[in-house]
């Protein structure tokens, strides 16, 4: 596993960390969008990042993904992170298997091997029989499954999810939660889930971070983590109330 860092050496780096930011600051013009942000995503953990619109959640994800370089502080990732967004961003003129294979662009693998790995990734998300389908024929849930397959085809240690289920209906969302947890259990990657949905954060995460005006202002460990989406947990309302209070939402 390759550890990569920016903005100076990372003393004490450990291979059980999938992704980490240390004292990161970022500006957009005169706006200080990230202020001394430090966070860690251990391998095999799901960390949710919640906050109001404009709090800097997607910027944190972009810095971790290596898509933003004009920041101060330190970034540590295990290998190349994978991303999935709210919009699947599939190429409509390429079939599903080819879209998934684009997740291996950096590897320069032979074409036949790319096809095999893409087909295996599609089987992983329950779409083995859709390899030759066209993106425009897919439902919203199927398209998001293809997006996950593309993210995971390169076998990343860190998966970054930016509101991936926000555009789906309630039942499809629960199905995607179950799929994500199944993939997480089987592959053991670390996850940073950016979401505006407090219930989703409590349902999926080991830890929830609250971002406010570019700062991490609260961290909540979900103990024990609830791993059965759609089923109520005795602790759910308590955690939900605490997070809503930190977000300034009156119940």
UniProtKB/Swiss-Prot annotation:
EC number: 7.6.2.14
UniProt-annotated location(s): Cell membrane
Stretches assigned to the ABC transporter domain: 19-238
Highest taxon of source: Bacteria
Listed GO MF terms: ATP binding; ATP hydrolysis activity
Binding sites annotated in the UniProt record for ATP: 51-58
Cellular-component GO terms for this entry: plasma membrane
Homology family: Belongs to the ABC transporter superfamily. Aliphatic sulfonates importer (TC 3.A.1.17.2) family.
Protein name in the entry: Aliphatic sulfonates import ATP-binding protein SsuB
């Amino acid at each position: 596993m390759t550890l990569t860092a920016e903005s100076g050496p990372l003393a004490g780096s450990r291979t059980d960390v999938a992704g980490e930011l240390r004292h990161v600051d970022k500006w957009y013009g005169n706006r200080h969008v990230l202020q001394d942000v430090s966070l860690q995503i251990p391998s095999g953990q799901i960390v949710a990042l919640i906050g109001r619109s404009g709090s800097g959640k997607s910027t944190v994800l972009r810095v971790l993904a290596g898509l933003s370089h004009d920041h101060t502080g330190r970034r540590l990732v295990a290998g190349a992170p994978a991303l999935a967004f709210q919009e699947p961003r599939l190429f409509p003129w390429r079939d599903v298997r080819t879209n998934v294979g684009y997740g291996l662009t950096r590897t320069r693998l032979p074409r036949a091997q790319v096809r095999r790995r893409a087909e295996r990734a599609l089987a992983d998300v329950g779409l083995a029989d859709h390899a030759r389908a066209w993106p425009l024929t897919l439902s919203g849930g199927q398209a998001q499954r293809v997006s996950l397959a593309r993210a995971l085809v390169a076998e990343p240690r860190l998966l970054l999810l930016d509101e991936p289920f926000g555009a789906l209906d309630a039942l499809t969302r629960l199905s995607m939660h179950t799929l994500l947890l199944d993939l997480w259990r089987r592959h053991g990657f670390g996850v940073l889930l950016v979401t505006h949905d407090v219930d989703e954060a409590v349902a999926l995460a080991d830890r929830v971070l609250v971002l406010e005006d570019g700062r991490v202002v609260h961290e909540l460990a979900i103990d024990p983590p609830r791993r059965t989406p759609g089923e109520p947990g005795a602790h759910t309302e308590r955690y939900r109330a605490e997070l809503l209070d930190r977000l300034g939402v009156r119940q």
